Amino acid sequence: MMKNLISSISYDQGEIINNILRLHVPSHKIDCDPTYSKGNFYKKYNVPEPQLKFDISPCLPEVVQADCRHLPMENDSIDCLMFDPPFLATKGPSLSKDDDNNKINKRFGVYPTEKELFQFYTDSLVEFHRVL
């Protein structure tokens, strides 16, 4: 009985994700990451990398270019997906300045309005429902 008991308190993202995989995903692995970027999350938190890696602007040769709202996958083809989307909305002029400000925004992109950001989330979730 104790082997199925997992603490619900943790400050370690890797521990949290690995526990979710253990409890809820029979294969204990993430099949797809549609917003992979450089995969630093997997390396930093010791989470097994997904077989299917997509990104709108791939940084690595093994990552396939794809918009997460239109994945090149069959319906019902995977069991688990990791989604780490853009989370910022701004119209600030600092995005166009050539300086060290807004590093996150410049690297990952932003949406001009919260409404557009939330629409991106909604469209992405509809697509994930299709492939899961």
Task: Give the role of each language-model region.
Residues 1-132:
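Class I S-adenosyl-L-methionine-dependent methyltransferase catalytic core
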